[in-house]
Amino acid sequence: LSKADRLQRAAANLPVEKRLRTIEEMGRIWRRRWESGELDGVAERLAQSTGYSPEVIRLEMSFVAEVLDPEKMMKNLESTLRGGAASLEGMVPISDGENIRNHPCGPALVISSGNSLVPPFIPTITALATGNLTILKPSLSNYEAVLAVISTLEEAVKTTGAQEMLDLLVVSYFSHRSEVLDHLLTNARIGVVNYWGGDPGRGEVSAKVAMNPHMPRYFVNGPLTGFAVIDENSADEEAARGLAMNILLYDQQLCSSPTQAAFIGSMEAAKRFCAMVGSELDALGKGMAMGMSDDGAFILQCSRKYVQFAGGRVFSSNDTDNMWTITLSESVSDLDEASQSYGPLAFHNRRRFLEVIRVDDNERVIDLIGDLPDNNAYRGADKVQTIGLAVSAARKEALMPSLPSTGAYRIVPLEDMFMRSPLEPYDGMDMAKLFTYGVYQRDTSLGKEVLD
């Protein structure tokens, strides 16, 4: 940290094109290692440590190259930074006689989530591309895989000559009670802290950051969830398959994963659609074995019974490698009542578990999305991040004026809930802005006109 200013000044003189070329080379190296089988052992151990199926981990390992896509990063920088990517290199005109330059506000400390590999690199690559000295704290479960990605940077700079980027990155594992981590949060000269996760961790980190005399920025990517909206006219096999795939990916641990859905139409049509989704979960889930202990299977069966006692209809599978569950209720969430009676039914304990609520109109859909944080069955999720739509054009037009007011951050096609565009904010925030600050420069005087 004592060298942070010098290192960030050196990186500030590195052309953005060279920074992105280095990131591109990282992606090329990763892709080569992955396709050659060099990373098979890392993938196997990551599956064991995270509990995800080998098939899901293999998919995630292939996603790493997407995070290292220079064209996507350039689009993100151009669309989010005032003055565009060029403002990271020098002053850029924004009006006659007025200029702006975006500087890194680091050193940056990224405390990442531990349930997969890709999330740690979303803020880390952005922080590096914007010139921040970056300290990345992965979790014990993904530490080895994170180091495997970082090793591509070590090789990439030999080709691009961008040693400054390698000098900016530090990867360290700290326990939650680490004295070093405590020092970083409470006393170190840190410019920004990015925490991924929920309570109690984020509250503890927030309290410590508030004590830091250097007043670092603090922003959180908290636990969120997905909500699907389907109407009777769009309840076809394509919608069922898209919904099933988003349920299976990462066993609903993504912030975009659908955990609740509203079906607008008759109860009979809702039953048919739930059965269709179940068939797709059977077919697709066979290739993504989840695995479940006897204790876990017993708890899940009890959970299903409690939902039935609360009045819900249950569609389910008893295949221990693919134990999916769909509940269907009328107008209100039966899971709300059931989860109050049965603790193990809590939000973070559910995997491949979707609650479908049949409703009559658009207004009820809006209410369900906005009320989800107050539903006992979803305690642990701050709110809805992603709304996935499979509705008619007319219904979409009717819904769109109200959907943004629900607090959700993303409204996308149902089958595409897990995919991100480089142009979209991350949980409502432009991440490149969070790792930079704007320096404004003006050549002309404005005060004379006011004082005269």
List where the protein language model places each region.
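NAD(P)-dependent aldehyde/semialdehyde dehydrogenase
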Residues: 241, 250-258, 262-381, 397, ...
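Short active-site oxyanion
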Residues: 190-193, 352-354, 383-386
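Structural signal for terminal/edge beta-strands and the immediately following C-terminal loop/tail
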Residues: 425-452
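Structural motif
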Residues: 195-199, 231-233, 264-266, 329-330, ...
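Short internal beta-strands
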Residues: 135-141, 262, 388-390
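Rossmann-like NAD(P) dinucleotide-binding subdomain of oxidoreductase/dehydrogenase enzymes
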Residues: 88-249
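N-terminal Rossmann-like NAD(P)+-binding subdomain of aldehyde/semialdehyde dehydrogenases
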Residues: 1-100, 384
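Core active-site phosphate/anionic-ligand binding loop and the adjoining beta-turn-alpha structural block
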Residues: 62-66, 73-74, 78, 82, ...
